[in-house]
């Protein structure tokens, strides 16, 4: 049960706000491990909405996630996947409003 770590960059124009933070927490809580996140020397419990939001991670912020426990490796893989997919959020240039990927709303906005 070693430590597993990944570094991600926040690519959401609105940063790591409440909706993606909630999805991140829900994802992490599914795994048997502890996860910490660090940004510029500040550390937080990645399973805590207050911890995540207190980092004030805006666009282009670098975050380091460290997991330890039985399912640490798979948790880190899922965290990386969420950030790579930008939490499945799309912000069309014309409206600037949030559209969930894979919905009819997304198809109509293109």
Residues covered by each model-derived region:
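Compact, glycine-rich, soluble single-domain proteins
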Residues: 9-58
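Short, low-order "capping/linker" segments at domain edges
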Residues: 96-110
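Glycine/charge-rich, flexible interdomain linkers and switch-proximal surface loops
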Residues: 44-47, 95-99
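Intrinsic-disorder/low-complexity, polar/charged segments enriched in Ser/Thr/Lys/Arg/Asp/Glu/Gln
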Residues: 3-7, 62-64
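Alpha-helix boundary/capping detector
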Residues: 50-54, 70, 78, 105
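Short, charged N-terminal helix-start/capping segments
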Residues: 1-3, 110
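C-terminal structural segments of small proteins and small subunits
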Residues: 61-98
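N-terminal processing/targeting junctions
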Residues: 59-61, 104
